[in-house]
Amino acid sequence: MSSPDSPTVVTLEAIGYLRNALATRVEAARQPRAAAGAAARIELLPGRNFEHALEDLASWELIWVIFWFHLNSGWRPKVLPPRSTTGRKGVFSTRSPHRPNPIGMSAVRLERVEGLNLYIRDTDMLDGTPVLDIKPYVAYTDAHPDAGTGW
C-alpha cells in the first residue's frame, strides 16, 4: 500500500517507438494541432500479439497516442507557458512536458495501419519517442467544446 511518504512505484514498458525526421525539441510543434500535416510512423514491437490489438483500429480517424517525454531531464513545479501574459504557472495547469512523470498525450490523425506500423499525421512527437499506449479518439466523450479555459 502506498502513502504520501512512500508513493507507489509504477513500471511501464514501451509498446513501440515513433519514427519521423524530427530529432530535436525545437523542430517539433508545441501541440499536435500546430503540426498539421507532419507525418510519422509508430512502429510497434514484435512478438507481443500487437497485431491482434490493432484489429479494428484502422476504422478510426483520430487516435490518442500516450507517450514518454524521453528527452526531458527533471521537472519544474512552475513553468512559463508560451502564451502566458501573466508569468509562471503551476505545471499541472499547463501542457508543459516538464512534469513529475513525463507522460504526454497527443490526438493524431491515423492514415493507415500496415502490420505493426501505424502511419499518422499532425504529430508533435520526436523520432524515437517511446509510445506507451494507443486509444481511439471518441468525439462524443473526448471533445468538450463548451469547456472554459484557465488563467
Predicted regions and their residues:
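Glycine-rich, low-complexity intrinsically disordered segments
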Residues: 1-107, 111-151
